[in-house]
């Protein structure tokens, strides 16, 4: 982003693509650009087996080491640590914490209700994080950590979170590209003086 806030007169796609270009995020995978995002009603539609990858550890700065793909049976026992906190990903546990694994993500969810954000499928979240931001180093365990951390933050806290954590940067990127959240931010006139720095470059 070159300005301090989003331009409400600018269309959603134009604003998003401008942000991508300004933030040097544009990248192509198998001939697909960021138009891919706007043409899919569900992130899951283009997901292959990206949810079958093994776990990885998250270090002091939230970096995730890349792993080879594992078989699907290992997914329930993946672990990741963040600041010494180990988390075992379990389908039933995640559902019990408020995420419905059977619901499709919807662009029309209410921006002010963070809980509805967790209706996205874990596979959709994993695919989205890999496709548009972090690449293959993101695992299902990182998605689990991301959801757990996001549940402890309000929308505004997520906007203002620091750039030195992997999960926080992912949170900001997620909220920006969700249609209703983007519109909500435009209406509220939130400032993004640090948005490009936080989102465009993953912590190293």
UniProtKB/Swiss-Prot annotation:
Keywords: Mitochondrion. It is found in: Mitochondrion. Residues 47-108 are annotated as: Disordered. GO terms for cellular component: mitochondrion. Residues 49-106 have a biased composition (Acidic residues). It comes from Paramecium tetraurelia. This is Uncharacterized mitochondrial protein ORF9.
């Amino acid at each position: 982003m070159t300005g301090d806030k989003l331009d409400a007169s600018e269309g959603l796609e134009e604003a998003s693509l401008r942000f991508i270009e300004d933030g040097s995020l544009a990248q192509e995978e198998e001939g697909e650009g960021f138009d891919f995002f706007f043409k899919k009603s569900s992130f899951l539609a283009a997901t292959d087996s990206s949810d079958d990858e093994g776990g990885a550890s998250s270090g002091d700065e939230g970096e995730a080491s890349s792993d080879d793909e594992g078989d699907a049976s290992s997914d329930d026992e993946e672990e990741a640590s963040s600041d010494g906190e180990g988390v075992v990903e379990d389908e039933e546990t995640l559902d019990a914490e408020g995420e419905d694994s059977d619901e499709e993500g919807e662009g029309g969810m209410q921006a002010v209700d963070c809980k509805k954000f967790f209706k996205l499928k874990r596979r959709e979240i994993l695919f989205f994080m890999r496709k548009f931001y972090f690449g293959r180093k993101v695992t299902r365990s990182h998605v689990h950590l991301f959801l757990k951390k996001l549940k402890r933050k309000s929308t505004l806290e997520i906007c203002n979170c620091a750039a030195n954590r992997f999960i926080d940067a992912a949170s900001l990127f997620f909220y920006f590209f969700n249609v209703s959240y983007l519109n909500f931010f435009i209406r509220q006139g939130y400032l993004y003086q640090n948005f490009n720095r936080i989102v465009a470059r993953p912590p190293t």
